[in-house]
């Protein structure tokens, strides 16, 4: 055990003894401990949890963050650093066993007294045989009423199955199917939070969600696609989007299958800022884009996603369609550096995500990718080898030069000139200030084409 963490635990244990109140580590802390996974979130429960939290936060000189101040259900958090925080929750019921009976799944319904944990005694309190389910890699609900008490648990079952790589026990899956519509009672921001965690897993359990029919409740458009067929094969309209989702998931796991020169760079990109999850979300709602009246931004706002996340999904969908359109010909498209540069400039932060989604669409639709692969690699190579390094160097020309030397004022042409000069610099057409000024003077009187 980390010496710093042990010191924290000793202090908390001492406070609980002073208050004559037993304190336990519970839930995900015990699950991760038994799985030998790194623990960043320590969950405590005690009848005196609020007072222990207040006194300990004061002792370690950290802010006490209230997560829930409902009388009898108080939860407080103390953040020690970005990778370590302690949560203190009031014991539910008179005993730890009563508390555990109110938790969601057997693997989360275990506890150990803090003194035993400190002394590394494996005296696990496990009334629902969670240790057996951990060993057998099974998600099992503690009691059926768990889904009625908090319908978000319907989705959490799949989140844990996805993040841990576990199966959902048959009866639990059946109960989810029975209670599936109750997910509509849950605030959309809570649903979005769980969906992001689920989709952020390397293998999101879409097939299990389909079996329970929860997927169709969360995304009603999928239910419509499942009932519509494509003649003459009779295949449902959902089969294509589902294949695209699976191909995207596979591509994110193994980009070296087709994009070997850039595989490690891509893995680094998708690991940041929820890109992994948001890309999969893009694939899930892509079928809706076929409806000309569909407003992706408004649709995503219903989930209370951040504006940044909404823009990422919207622009990924938009620019992936451009990639598919531009590479539709036998030649593959994007052959000229100028074309590549302009697409990179327009797509911005969503360049890579749009390329990956477009690739998944081609794979999912079982289209010929012989010419598509070189096109995507050509764009990635230009972006990584030329465009990104060029962004680290200052522009040859700025607005001050246009104002001072050419007597221009900020206007659409002003922006047009700066963009064209920057394009020429990145493409290697010009290298010096003199060349930049010469090009600017030519652009002042040339026809103007504003970029999007």
What are these regions, as identified by a protein language model?
Residues 1-452:
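Catalytic cores of the polymerase beta-like nucleotidyltransferase superfamily
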């Amino acid at each position: 055990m980390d010496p710093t963490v042990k010191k924290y635990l000793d202090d908390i244990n001492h406070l609980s003894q002073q208050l004559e109140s037993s304190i336990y580590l519970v839930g995900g802390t015990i699950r991760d401990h038994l799985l030998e996974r790194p623990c960043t979130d320590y969950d405590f429960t005690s009848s005196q949890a609020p007072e222990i939290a207040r006194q300990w936060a004061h002792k370690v000189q950290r802010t006490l963050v209230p997560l829930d101040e409902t009388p009898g259900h108080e939860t407080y958090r103390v953040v020690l650093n970005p990778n370590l925080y302690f949560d203190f929750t009031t014991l539910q019921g008179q005993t730890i066993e009563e508390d555990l009976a109110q938790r969601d799944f057997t693997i989360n319904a275990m506890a150990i007294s803090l003194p035993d944990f400190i002394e590394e005694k494996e005296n696990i309190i496990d009334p629902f045989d969670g240790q057996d389910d951990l060993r057998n890699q099974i998600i099992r609900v503690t009691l059926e009423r768990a889904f009625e008490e908090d319908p978000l648990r319907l989705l959490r079952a799949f989140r844990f199955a996805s993040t841990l790589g576990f199966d959902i026990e048959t009866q639990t899956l059946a109960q989810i199917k029975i209670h599936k519509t109750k997910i509509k009672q849950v605030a959309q921001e809570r649903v979005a939070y769980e969906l992001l965690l689920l989709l952020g897993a390397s293998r999101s359990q879409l097939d299990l969600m389909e079996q329970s029919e929860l997927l169709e409740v969360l995304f009603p458009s999928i239910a419509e696609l499942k009932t519509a067929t494509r003649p003459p094969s009779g295949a449902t309209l959902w089969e294509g989007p589902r294949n695209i989702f699976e191909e995207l998931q596979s591509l994110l796991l193994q980009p070296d299958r087709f994009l070997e020169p850039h595989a490690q760079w891509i893995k680094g990109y998708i690991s940041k800022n929820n890109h992994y999850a948001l890309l999969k979300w893009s694939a899930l709602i892509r079928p809706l884009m076929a409806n000309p009246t569909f407003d992706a931004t408004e649709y995503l706002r219903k989930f209370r996603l951040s504006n940044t996340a909404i823009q990422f999904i919207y622009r990924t969908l938009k620019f992936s369609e451009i990639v598919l359109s531009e590479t539709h010909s036998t030649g593959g498209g994007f052959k000229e550096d100028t074309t590549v540069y302009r697409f990179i400039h327009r797509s911005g932060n969503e360049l890579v995500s749009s390329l990956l989604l477009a690739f998944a669409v081609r794979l999912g639709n079982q289209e010929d990718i012989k010419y598509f692969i070189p096109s995507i690699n050509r764009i990635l190579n230009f972006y990584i080898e030329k465009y990104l390094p060029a962004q680290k160097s200052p522009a040859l020309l700025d607005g001050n030069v246009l104002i001072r030397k050419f007597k221009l004022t900020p206007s659409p042409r002003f922006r047009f000139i700066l963009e064209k000069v920057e394009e020429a610099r990145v493409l290697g057409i010009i290298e010096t200030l003199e060349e930049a000024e010469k090009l600017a003077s030519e652009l002042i009187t040339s026809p103007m084409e504003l970029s999007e």
